[in-house]
């Protein structure tokens, strides 16, 4: 498996995301640049210029018309995907940590950090109502008093959002009323990443407590646990197979004090049902911060602390592989 190396960032990668068809790959890092690449050959299609701080999150809508980014420059920005033009600038009081389009692409949500005396909020804007954008007034704002949100995604059919907190809690918030519908605490430490399955019936969480866990997306019932020896920064579910890929490594601050072999910087593949690890992919120099499966399941990408993104196309052996129970 020879990876395609994407070199477009000067700082460590914070998130990578495919669009729905998987022909484009969006990457953001702790620099102000938002890059978009052709996933088939790793050619850079363009950049979205405008942010002035680290970019924490990126999302593309269903038909890849618009791109949404959230940054530490205290803004969430909406872009025209094709032209790179900035369509909206939503100012916030603190850094924007997570952002996302709902299934229809009409409503956006983003969450802000608890910092500088400001509370953590989840804001909802309806893009069909220009007055909300112009006045920077969301139609709904949910305060999070206890523990800040560290990752969030839209639930099935855009009826709720699923948010992971610094404390390890998972909350399901209604997108209509803002109330907490379900609350569970299966992780003991911060939830770094949440990714849904292709059919949105379940999702996988990646946590600092060295595990990734599988949950039902409506009841938030805990199904499976994938254990490692290192904090897990990101986890993604295969759209075709019962496989989950985990990316992680140590905390960035411990990296220089150990050799790479001890750091365990491989991407690790687990079987979804048996919770057994069956493969590893080396490559990154430093921890992996974000992983994503291509929507056709034939490749996956990872973005690391080293600032590189690697696109891996699976060998034929991967597709013939049968797991012996």
Swiss-Prot record:
Record key words, sorted: Acetylation, Cytoplasm, Initiation factor, Isopeptide bond, Phosphoprotein, Protein biosynthesis, Repeat, Ubl conjugation, WD repeat
List residues, modification N6-acetyllysine.
264
WD repeat ranges per the UniProt record: 8-47, 50-91, 144-183, 186-225, 283-324
Q: Which domain of life is it from?
A: Eukaryota
Which GO BP terms, alphabetically? Answer: cytoplasmic translational initiation; formation of cytoplasmic translation initiation complex; translational initiation
Task: State if Transmembrane is listed as a keyword.
Answer: no
Any one GO CC term of the record: eukaryotic translation initiation factor 3 complex, eIF3m
Where's the Glycyl lysine isopeptide (Lys-Gly) (interchain with G-Cter in ubiquitin) crosslink?
Answer: 282
The cross-references to Gene3D superfamilies, in alphabetical order and at most eight, read:
YVTN repeat-like/Quinoprotein amine dehydrogenase
Where does the record say this protein resides?
Cytoplasm
Mention any Pfam family matching this sequence: EIF3I
What is the recorded post-translational modification? Phosphorylated by TGF-beta type II receptor.
Q: Which InterPro entries does the UniProt record give?
A: eIF3i, WD40/YVTN_repeat-like_dom_sf, WD40_repeat_CS, WD40_repeat_dom_sf, WD40_rpt
Q: Which residues carry this modification: Phosphotyrosine?
A: 308
Q: Can you provide one Gene Ontology molecular function annotated for this UniProt record?
A: RNA binding
Could you say which protein family the record assigns here? Belongs to the eIF-3 subunit I family.
Query: PANTHER family attached here?
Result: EUKARYOTIC TRANSLATION INITIATION FACTOR 3 SUBUNIT I
Its quaternary organisation is: Component of the eukaryotic translation initiation factor 3 (eIF-3) complex, which is composed of 13 subunits: EIF3A, EIF3B, EIF3C, EIF3D, EIF3E, EIF3F, EIF3G, EIF3H, EIF3I, EIF3J, EIF3K, EIF3L and EIF3M. The eIF-3 complex appears to include 3 stable modules: module A is composed of EIF3A, EIF3B, EIF3G and EIF3I; module B is composed of EIF3F, EIF3H, and EIF3M; and module C is composed of EIF3C, EIF3D, EIF3E, EIF3K and EIF3L. EIF3C of module C binds EIF3B of module A and EIF3H of module B, thereby linking the three modules. EIF3J is a labile subunit that binds to the eIF-3 complex via EIF3B.
Q: What job does the chain carry out?
A: Component of the eukaryotic translation initiation factor 3 (eIF-3) complex, which is required for several steps in the initiation of protein synthesis. The eIF-3 complex associates with the 40S ribosome and facilitates the recruitment of eIF-1, eIF-1A, eIF-2:GTP:methionyl-tRNAi and eIF-5 to form the 43S pre-initiation complex (43S PIC). The eIF-3 complex stimulates mRNA recruitment to the 43S PIC and scanning of the mRNA for AUG recognition.
Recorded protein name is: Eukaryotic translation initiation factor 3 subunit I
Q: What is the source species? A: Rattus norvegicus
- Gene that this polypeptide is encoded by: Eif3i
